[in-house]
Amino acid sequence: MNSETRVKIKTIWISLLLLLGFLFLDRVLFPIALFEFPNELEWDTSPWYNFLHKQRNIRFEKDEKGILIAGSSVALYSAYPKQITDEIRTSNIKDGEKFRAEFYSHPALSPTDLHYYSDDILNKKPELVVYVLNPADLQLDYIQKKEYSEVSFDEQARLKDYKIRHQNRFIFPGEFLADHWKDYTKGEFFAQLTKALILLNRFRSFVYDPWIEYMEHHTRTMRSYHYYTGAMPEEGIFLRGWTPPRFTIECELKNGKLSEEIFVQKPGINVAIEEFTESGLPLKFISFGKTYTKSGWHSLVLETQKDRSSNVPQKAKFRFTVSPTTSSDEVDARIFGIAATYGIRLTQNFCRNEIRTGISYERIHGLDDDRIETMSDEDYLKDYEKRLYYNPENEGALNRLKKIQKNKEILGNSPYFTWSEMQFLEKTIAKFKANGQKLIIINSPENPIESKYYKNGNWYQGYLKFLSSHKSDTLGFYDLKDAIPDKKLFLDPHHLTFNGAKRSSALYTDAILNFLNVSTRKE
């Protein structure tokens, strides 16, 4: 063997070792570092990381009867798995105490996505899959009505957009590429193939999210955050941490002190704090009072009263009074149609010492939702229109929700026809049926001010017949589109308020119990 051959062999071995080392890093160490790391992300943050983390960790024990609640944000904003679990366990259904419901949902989960998740769902061996479906999940964006032609669905535009959809690139890139490789250009093909083969490339857009959150919680001040996760004031709190002008809160103390930070929007804001005694009455004097001359974040350190045993107290209850108030329009005019009234903003984990993990699928109750429920009909419609459809930067722009609303009107005057999303749903139904997997499809509650555009038309009636035609011993269908007639329980066309979701969760439980009872009798 000459020296040139030895060099070639050595090069091959080194290349193989480097390749194996990279594969070990990418396929073994990287997933451990990413998904075994504490997930401290809260509700509605980093949806793709949270879904992948949830997907990996859903497990049902042999003596459990699992329920997977699948769907898009329609499911996330209309179902509470814990409530459904509790209601089933306290029902009189056989083995009710063995049931446990979990989300298998992420934003924009379409029937196409459900089809690609079907093998993973079957591998988890749930007793039942509940698919919460709204017609908007069928990608109504691509409905079109051209002059002198019938209503149709633009499959080419859908496929073009699907090639760059997050879930198609992050969650099932290989499977999607295998089915649609003929529709990719050479550059698109290799870009998708790279995501299919290399996890570091696939997950790079959200790889830092859990680590950044961890650093913010453990080494910084928790000023920068999406949603509030701290102690809950008795009067409630807005999701982004803004308080009412007057609120009462029980705080976990640090060495007997209230040691936190607060944010004031403008100079001249006064914050007065009263501490409650052990008997539950506020002290006769103001424990803290200060007028802030500068806007921004400020430290808040307050000595508390010792209890009767003179021990260092662990908790204390305070009443905050803030004046003058702040309008939500001063902070961000895009959040609400009709301005809300704020007091101060709290740090993310205000008055709570524990940094919680595993809360990314636990919805947070905010005053954002409650304010809508107490509006007059006139104010609700005014807030709704401005919050959802008004674009001050470009009044002529047609946002997605407005486009879907217009397409619902088009469908309202159209005969029934199907497109690819229904075909993928049929494939999933057939696969579940072949594997004996029980499935419930729920046509989700819809805001009556939106459903009026198409629910009485031929297309919608044909759609309901399409879903109902698949009913069998292993598949149930429940039409709940009109089950919540109060428009003020809806944030938008199909997302429910916190309290509205409690009502729909109870309806979902009724549907589940009805289906399981019927299935049990047939067995």
Predicted regions: what is each one?
Residues 2-19:
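N-terminal Sec-pathway targeting helices
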Residues 22, 27-96, 116-117, 231:
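Membrane/wall-proximal cationic-aromatic binding patches
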Residues 70, 74-165:
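Membrane-embedded segments
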Residues 147-244, 339-435:
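Secreted/periplasmic serine-hydrolase-like ester/acetyl group-modifying domain
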Residues 223-361:
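Basic, ligand-binding patches in group-transfer machinery
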Residues 403-409, 445-460:
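Active-site His/acidic residue clusters
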Residues 425-440, 469-476:
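A structural motif corresponding to the C-terminal end of an alpha-helix
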Residues 454-456, 460-521:
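C-terminal regions of proteins
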